[in-house]
Amino acid sequence: MSPPPPPPIWRQLSFSLLLGSFCIALESAAQGNSATDALNILLIIVDDLRPSLGCYGDKLVRSPNIDQLASHSVLFQNAFAQQAVCAPSRVSFLTGRRPDTTRLYDFNSYWRVHSGNFSTIPQYFKENGYVTMSVGKVFHPGISSNHSDDYPYSWSFPPYHPSSEKYENTKTCKGQDGKLHANLLCPVDVADVPEGTLPDKQSTEEAIRLLEKMKTSASPFFLAVGYHKPHIPFRYPKEFQKLYPLENITLAPDPHVPDSLPPVAYNPWMDIREREDVQALNISVPYGPIPEDFQRKIRQSYFASVSYLDTQVGHVLSALDDLRLAHNTIIAFTSDHGWALGEHGEWAKYSNFDVATRVPLMLYVPGRTAPLPAAGQKLFPYRDPFDPASDWMDAGRHTEDLVELVSLFPTLAGLAGLPVPPRCPIPSFHVELCREGQNLQKHLQLHDLEEEPDLFGNPRELIAYSQYPRPADFPQWNSDKPSLNDIKVMGYSIRTVDYRYTVWVGFDPSEFLANFSDIHAGELYFVDSDPLQDHNVYNDSQHGGLLHSLRP
């Protein structure tokens, strides 16, 4: 028996937006290269990284190596994940399908079994002659990737996981009492932790080893490197804390729960509450708040984790340069979703707000996004975040256009010279190779307008979609990560250059169906007048015309 069709939300909402001149239809095809001039791919995926980076205008965070990459890339200022939680987001952008197609909203199913035998980005490159390799956290481990990181479909070799991963959530954090705890805040002396190393350090070492191996390979490579930090716990070398004195750390600009926020939209950050140092604060559920001094410490450790991550990225990029691979390797850098640092009185991800769904995204294409270096010069020399001289960086190319992570699949294929997978039909459960995202090559302006006019469109017509499930209309213990069978409400969200519109509707998990006549709550925020999304005007009568045009 064929599976039931997916919820019609995106088809219906897109149709409504088309009538209002908000929707764009883009198709593209790419000419294939011969094997001799094929470009390699380095895909760097970070866990829980919001765009708190120097290259995104953050004046506090020290990220000189990522900033350097951005200076040679096209940087997307407005890139959004399709669901702000690890496994669903990664499966979505690695297959090029939205969560309503993968049917993964939690961590407990494998898309090839429960939805469709969908091809992945690395699988497509593997089938086109690439050696595909995975280091660290690329797919989310466990059931959602078949306890194998989708090997052997996606990878030429079994994926590498650092041996020290198993200590991430154990009692390795030294408290003020001198004992070891499983804390949220966990700056460590690396020499004192089990194995004397950390997972991201091991991933960097393995990535460099593989690059050295591929230097002499006759085949092009696709290397995906997944970093853990700044995912909690904030377990990082303690010296990075010195970059962020507490007296320089401010609270979020909007640290309180907005009065107009529907309860269903709030995430009660239960994973943070489980940590021993947070438990000791005896914070009320669901809204808190966390004491202000501890809020500053959380933000300090998040930023310190980002700078630690930056050094690891810097070592990999420097090695790529030293091996003379930077001239023929496309680099894509992104995150699976963002992370709230106290905005709206929320922490972690698990929502449809920009702070949870907006991600960094940059694409480096050798000789096209930036000139190739002269002989003897390096594109990516390692930059020390502790060196003030590392702060200065040339500005790269930026685009303000709204884009989605689900567009990575067609974009990387096109940039590498492979045929761009066709757009998915509706439904597409029976189609192994297709994509629901756009080809972002148009934003890189690497094409001749006369040859491929359909690659270009009005930036104001672009839209980013995201969604998040809830088990109830009010925050409860499993609101952040409900299992499929517990989902009762789905929040579907549209982000345009002008507004974010979210509608929370009834959802039947047994049929994977949303009921758009059963509206539980709504949100409407105007970007220009309310960039932090604190003033929900969904119930204001003056916006009734806009809401009527948006409702399916």
From Swiss-Prot:
Induction: By glucose, in a dose dependent manner. Its main location: other. The modification 3-oxoalanine (Cys) is found at C86. Residues 30-35 form a propeptide. One of its GO terms (biological process) is heparan sulfate proteoglycan catabolic process. Monomer. The 58-kDa mature form is composed of two chains resulting from proteolitic processing, the 42-kDa chain and the 14-kDa chain that remain stably associated and form the 58-kDa intermediate form which is enzymatically active. PANTHER family: IDURONATE 2-SULFATASE (PTHR45953:SF1). Lysosomal enzyme involved in the degradation pathway of dermatan sulfate and heparan sulfate. Belongs to the sulfatase family. This is Iduronate 2-sulfatase. It comes from Mus musculus. The gene is Ids.
